[in-house]
Amino acid sequence: MIRSAVVLTVLVGVCLAQRGFVGGWSQVDPKIRPDLLELAHFAVASQTAGLEYYHTVLELTKASQQVVAGVNYKLTLKVAPSKCKVSETVYSKELCQPQLNAAPKDCEAQLYVVPWRNTKEVTSFECN
């Protein structure tokens, strides 16, 4: 009986560790979640301070999420300057292609999304 309880406790612990704890951060595979790439482009488009050209997303390398009253996302991405001038156009992932020989940067974006209110907000964006 005690042995069964111990085995059950260990199995529950393993399952919780794999799924992440409620309110905790859990890894998400960005390759199977195209909505995360859309969020990455949204985050990049909002970062215009001091830029002549928008940056554009080259690759979304890592993602995690935290379920709260909505969802927090941490996205790790590679960006590079695009061909689109901030002063002349609105950002478009289709039109704002990377400049030739542009040096990529590693960035982390954090976003807060409330799907039932149709709202999303960039809460943090930093590049190395």
Curated annotation (Swiss-Prot):
The keyword Signal applies. Residues 20-128 form the Cystatin domain. Keywords: Disulfide bond, Protease inhibitor, Secreted, Signal, Thiol protease inhibitor. Induction: Down-regulated by a blood meal. The keyword Signal applies. One of its GO terms (cellular component) is extracellular space. One of its GO terms (molecular function) is cysteine-type endopeptidase inhibitor activity. Residues 1-17 form the signal peptide. Its main location: secreted. It is found in: Secreted. InterPro entries: Cystatin_dom, Cystatin_sf, Prot_inh_cystat_CS. Inhibitor of cysteine proteinases. Strongly inhibits mammalian cathepsin B and H, and moderately inhibits mammalian cathepsin C. Also inhibits endogenous cathepsin B-like but not cathepsin C-like proteinases. May have a protective role against undesired digestion of a stored blood meal by endogenous peptidases. Belongs to the cystatin family. This is Cystatin-1. It comes from Ornithodoros moubata (Soft tick).
